[in-house]
Amino acid sequence: WFTDGLGTLKSVAIAPAELEGAFAEGIGFDGSVIEGFARIYEADMLAKPDPSTFQVLPWRGESPGTARMFCDLTLPDGAPSMADPRHVLQRALTKAADLGFTFYTHPEIEFFLLKQGSVPGTRPEPIDQAGYFDHVPHGNSHDFRRAAIGMLEAMGISVEFSHHEGAPGQNE
């Protein structure tokens, strides 16, 4: 996994037998077609999996399991890609640390749950009409949030709390 210059998640699947080669050499791809990356004459790029980010995906219950790793993006000579958002963040964090700053972050994920089967071209319908902090036990929103929290915690991501937000179908 990696993101383009606009933050869109990108991915490539690799067979387990090819993983050692990906660690050693990277996975080649055409950077000129990734939004915010290279010009056509700088197209050759490599995605190098970072083993420290290895994580089994709990929602993919099949056997064998599925895992993900984030990748560092490099040029063929091994130099980091200046367009790699991960590298940009690492450089910024290093500069901040050199100045005595520490970086803290905490995501707040909000989303809407919509009914299935909406007719294309029509306005999507929220799954409920609940409001801020409304308690709807055994409702679809409540059950979805519980399942999502379970998967996040299975990946080692702690969740402080969840609740219904102010708009119909809106959750945090």
Spell out what each predicted region is.
Residues 1-172:
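Glycine-rich, acidic/polar active-site loops that bind/position phosphate-bearing ligands
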